[in-house]
A protein has these predicted regions:
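N-terminal Rossmann-like or analogous alpha/beta NTP/dinucleotide-binding catalytic cores
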Residues: 1-112, 211-227, 331
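Short helix-capping/linker segments at secondary-structure and domain boundaries
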Residues: 29-35, 201-202, 227-228, 340-347
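Active-site neighborhoods of enzyme catalytic cores
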Residues: 52-134, 141-175, 348-371
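Catalytic adenosine-cofactor/nucleotide-binding cores of aminoacyl-tRNA synthetases and other
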Residues: 100, 214-215, 289, 293-371
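Active-site cores that bind ATP or allylic diphosphates and position pyrophosphate for catalysis
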Residues: 102-134, 138-230, 269, 290-310, ...
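Intrinsic disorder/low-complexity segments
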Residues: 128-146, 228-293, 371
Length: 371
């Protein structure tokens, strides 16, 4: 059975971009006769507020987007994340990083077209000699308690097919770099928490904005490390030794098990449910399952008149403002359905009424400007 999820961060009121994502995710799962679960990603201790989360749930119900089962709160799952971080550490794939954002920005220019900087491994164990002096300068007068924890990634290509944007081949070292899995303040980073929760909650379909497209290869690789069977891990031991020795020579991966398992080579580990994980859906999961059967669907972003993606600072687009104007949920859904290409007019409609009309083939790939 398809199990989709909506995983918002409760750092403010939902805006139309969030609702657009929730609607497409709900329609995609429900049109297949599946479940749709809610996970509250309240990992940021400074910005996440329970009141925002409760308001978010009220907004979803008001819109006609009910979820299955009880919501899962990431802030309550620290012990689970600790366990999986330890697994990565035991593999020799994590290291403390002393670099600040300013350090990173000062040593390299933005690499990706969206302005992101790909971390080049300054603090990686046994770095090439040109990096060593810089690292020693960074560690002066810094306590290990102020470090982030990064995951060592291989210099290899992850192939995957997005259900809406098609095939991609992403080189982890070039486009992602060694990424943070625990912040220096102790908070859990997005990638680790998401991968663990999606696997343990039995999520089979991930729908989100195209700005997170590059998270897919990172998460596929991390799933491989955490949930691949022991026998398959042995096949990739040589690759990990090369990584931790700092050998970054580019190579063509002909055996996908050296980087990520293929459908033919995969021997998935059966993952037993643990106490609390049944909260993810009505009645919970009833058996072991493979955490690898995940489909990704990314959607275009809703942007303001200046072409910038909507954010929680766009107050005229948030549900607090919109509900205050007296607009109905059917009007909001009707407008979003029209923008998604599901209908030919903005006629008010409910999510349930949209189910027979839904198809990913109708959804545009270009970002959508709100005027």
């Amino acid at each position: 059975m398809t199990r989709g999820r909506f995983a918002p961060s409760p750092t403010g009121r939902m805006h139309l971009g969030n609702v657009f994502c929730a609607l497409l995710s709900w329609l995609s799962a429900k049109s297949k006769g599946g479940e749709w679960v809610l996970r509250i990603e309240d990992l940021d201790p400074q910005r996440s507020k329970k009141d925002y989360a409760l308001q978010l749930m009220d907004d979803l119900q008001w819109l006609g987007l009910p979820w299955d089962g009880e919501p899962v709160w990431q802030s309550q799952r620290g012990e689970i994340y600790e366990e999986y971080l330890q697994r990565l550490t035991d593999m020799g794939l994590t290291y403390p990083c002393y670099c600040t954002r300013a350090d990173i920005m000062a040593t390299q220019a933005p690499h990706e077209t969206d302005g992101r900087v790909v971390y080049k491994g300054t603090c990686r164990p046994n770095p090439p000699s040109p990096i060593t002096p810089h690292r020693s300068q960074l560690t002066v007068n810094r306590s290990p308690l102020t470090t982030t924890t990064r995951l060592i990634v291989p210099d290899c290509t992850i192939p995957f097919t997005d259900g809406h944007y098609g095939k991609h081949d992403i080189n982890l070292a070039e486009h992602c770099g060694d990424y943070i899995i625990r912040r220096k303040d102790g908070a859990w980073a997005y990638q680790l928490a998401v991968v663990v929760d999606d696997a343990l909650m039995g999520v089979t379909e991930i729908v989100r904005g195209r700005d997170l497209l590059l998270s897919s290869p990172q998460q596929i690789h991390l799933r491989n490390l955490l949930f691949q069977s022991t026998d398959d891990r042995v096949q990739s031991t040589e690759n990990r030794v090369q990584m931790t020795d700092g050998l970054l020579k580019r190579k063509t991966i002909t055996d996908a098990a050296r980087c990520v398992p293929t459908a033919t080579s995969l021997t998935p580990q059966t993952v037993p449910l643990r106490q609390g994980d049944e909260r993810s859906g009505g009645g919970g999961l009833t058996a072991h399952y493979s955490p690898f059967n995940v489909d990704f669907f990314h959607h275009p972003l809703l942007c303001n008149a200046e072409g910038q993606r909507l954010c929680k600072r766009d107050k005229s687009m948030d549900l607090g403002y919109l509900r205050g104007t007296g607009i109905t949920p059917q009007e909001i859904i009707g407008k979003l359905a029209y923008l998604a290409g599901l209908t030919d007019s903005t006629t008010p409609i409910t999510p349930s009424e949209l189910l027979p009309l839904f198809s990913w083939k109708k959804v545009p790939t270009e970002d959508i400007i709100l005027k």
